[in-house]
C-alpha cells in the first residue's frame, strides 16, 4: 500500500492537480516571495517584448513547481511544452523538442537534474545564444549543421538542485526556491479544493487537515479526499474537526504530520543509537528503505520541523523528537 504522506504523485492525482491548477499568479496561493519576484520579471519581459530569462524552480516534491511553470506560461501568454529529464535520453530527442518551439515559448523540463550529460551540453548554447550545432551523418561523411532557435524560456524543476552541474545552473537567470507552505496558506488551499469538488468542510477541519499535511498541497489534497470518505461513511457527509481527527488518526497521521515511517526513523535513532549521531546509510538499512528515499522523502520535513539535525558525524534526534514520541531526553 502506498504511503499516504508520500509527496510523489499517486494514481489519478495528475488529473486532480490539473483540475485544481490556478491559471495566474494572483490565483496561486502561497510562495509569495517567488511569486512577487516572478511578477516583476514577467512584466518587464513583456514590456520589452522579450522572452523571459530562464527559470530554475527547486524544492521538495509536491510544492507546485509544475503548476508554477504553467502559470508563468499563462502570464506570458505563450505555449508551454512539457517534458522531463528521464524522458530525454539522447541529444536528438532534445533537438527535436527545441526545433518545434515558437518565439517566446516556454519549455518545461521536470527533474532536470536527471538529464544525461550529452543532452545537457546541447542546452548550453541553446539557453545562452539560442542556437545548436548538430552533427549529421557518421564517419568521414559527417558534417556540422548550425541551427538557429527562436528566443524561448527554459523552466527547469528539480528536487535536488545540488545535483545540477555548475555550467547548467549558471545559465538560469532566475531561481525560485519553493518552500513548505505556511499553515494559513495550506488551510486556504484545502478550502479551495473542497469548494471546487463541492465538499462541505468547516474551517476548523480545514485548519487541522492543513496542520497535518507536511506543508505540502499535494498531501493536503490527498488527505482531504480520504477524510471525505470517512465523513460519508462514519458521519453525515460534512467534514468537521471531529471526523478529520478520527480519520487522520486511523490513517496513522499524527498532529505534527508524521506517519509510521517518520516515527520509525525517529524511534530507530533513539532506541538503537541513543539519538545519534547515526549515518544515513546505516539508518536506511535499519528501517529497510533506500538511502535516497530517506534523504529525499522523509528527512527534509523532519529537519524542517526540528525533529532531526544534520551534523558532520551523522543525523541526531532532537529533544523535540524525544518529547513528541514520549521518551525521556537527557543532554549528552
From Swiss-Prot:
Region Small ATPAse domain (RuvB-S), annotated ranges: 182-252
Keywords: ATP-binding, Cytoplasm, DNA damage, DNA recombination, DNA repair, DNA-binding, Hydrolase, Nucleotide-binding
Record-listed Mg(2+) binding positions: 66
Biological process according to GO: DNA recombination; DNA repair
GO molecular-function term, one example from the UniProt record: four-way junction helicase activity
Database matches in SUPFAM superfamilies: P-loop containing nucleoside triphosphate hydrolases (SSF52540), Winged helix' DNA-binding domain (SSF46785)
A Gene Ontology term for the protein's cellular component: Holliday junction resolvase complex
Top EC category: hydrolase
Cellular compartment(s): Cytoplasm
Region (Head domain (RuvB-H)): 255-332
Main location as per UniProt: cytoplasm
Binding site for ATP: 20-21, 62, 65-67, 128-130, 171, 181, 218
Catalyzed reactions per annotation: ATP + H2O = ADP + phosphate + H(+)
Subunit composition and interactions: Homohexamer. Forms an RuvA(8)-RuvB(12)-Holliday junction (HJ) complex. HJ DNA is sandwiched between 2 RuvA tetramers; dsDNA enters through RuvA and exits via RuvB. An RuvB hexamer assembles on each DNA strand where it exits the tetramer. Each RuvB hexamer is contacted by two RuvA subunits (via domain III) on 2 adjacent RuvB subunits; this complex drives branch migration. In the full resolvosome a probable DNA-RuvA(4)-RuvB(12)-RuvC(2) complex forms which resolves the HJ.
PANTHER family: HOLLIDAY JUNCTION BRANCH MIGRATION COMPLEX SUBUNIT RUVB (PTHR42848:SF1), PTHR42848
Function noted in UniProt: The RuvA-RuvB-RuvC complex processes Holliday junction (HJ) DNA during genetic recombination and DNA repair, while the RuvA-RuvB complex plays an important role in the rescue of blocked DNA replication forks via replication fork reversal (RFR). RuvA specifically binds to HJ cruciform DNA, conferring on it an open structure. The RuvB hexamer acts as an ATP-dependent pump, pulling dsDNA into and through the RuvAB complex. RuvB forms 2 homohexamers on either side of HJ DNA bound by 1 or 2 RuvA tetramers; 4 subunits per hexamer contact DNA at a time.
Protein name per the record: Holliday junction branch migration complex subunit RuvB
Gene: ruvB
Amino acid at each position: 500500500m502506498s504511503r499516504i504522506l508520500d509527496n510523489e504523485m499517486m494514481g489519478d492525482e495528475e488529473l486532480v492537480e490539473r483540475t485544481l491548477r490556478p491559471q495566474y499568479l494572483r490565483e496561486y496561493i502561497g510562495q509569495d516571495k517567488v511569486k512577487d519576484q516572478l511578477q516583476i520579471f514577467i512584466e518587464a519581459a513583456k514590456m520589452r517584448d522579450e522572452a523571459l530569462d530562464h527559470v530554475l524552480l527547486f524544492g521538495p516534491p509536491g510544492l507546485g513547481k509544475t503548476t508554477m511553470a504553467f502559470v508563468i506560461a499563462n502570464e506570458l501568454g505563450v505555449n508551454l511544452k512539457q517534458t522531463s529529464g528521464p524522458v530525454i535520453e539522447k541529444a536528438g530527442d532534445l533537438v527535436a523538442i527545441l526545433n518545434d518551439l515558437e518565439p517566446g515559448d516556454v519549455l518545461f523540463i521536470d527533474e532536470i537534474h536527471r538529464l544525461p550529460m550529452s543532452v545537457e551540453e546541447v542546452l548550453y548554447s541553446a539557453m545562452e545564444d539560442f542556437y545548436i550545432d548538430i552533427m549529421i551523418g557518421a564517419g568521414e561523411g559527417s558534417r556540422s549543421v548550425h541551427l538557429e532557435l527562436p528566443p524561448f524560456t527554459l523552466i527547469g524543476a528539480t528536487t535536488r538542485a545540488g545535483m545540477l552541474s555548475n555550467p547548467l545552473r549558471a545559465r538560469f537567470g532566475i531561481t525560485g526556491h519553493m518552500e513548505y507552505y505556511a499553515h494559513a496558506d495550506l488551510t486556504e488551499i484545502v478550502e479551495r479544493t473542497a469548494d471546487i469538488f463541492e465538499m462541505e468542510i468547516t474551517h476548523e477541519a480545514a485548519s487541522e487537515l492543513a496542520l497535518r499535511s507536511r506543508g505540502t498541497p499535494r498531501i493536503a489534497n490527498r488527505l482531504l479526499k480520504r477524510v471525505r470518505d470517512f465523513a460519508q461513511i462514519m458521519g453525515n457527509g460534512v467534514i468537521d474537526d471531529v471526523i478529520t481527527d478520527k480519520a487522520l488518526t486511523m490513517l496513522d497521521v499524527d498532529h505534527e504530520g508524521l506517519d509510521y515511517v517518520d516515527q520509525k526513523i525517529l524511534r530507530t535513532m533513539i532506541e538503537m543509537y541513543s539519538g545519534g549521531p547515526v549515518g544515513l546509510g546505516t539508518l536506511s538499512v535499519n528501517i529497510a528503505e533506500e538511502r535516497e528515499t530517506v534523504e529525499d522523502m522523509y528527512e527534509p520535513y523532519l529537519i524542517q520541523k526540528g525533529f532531526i539535525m544534520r551534523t558532520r558525524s551523522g543525523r541526531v534526534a532532537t529533544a523535540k523528537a524525544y518529547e513528541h514520541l514520549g521518551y525521556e531526553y537527557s543532554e549528552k
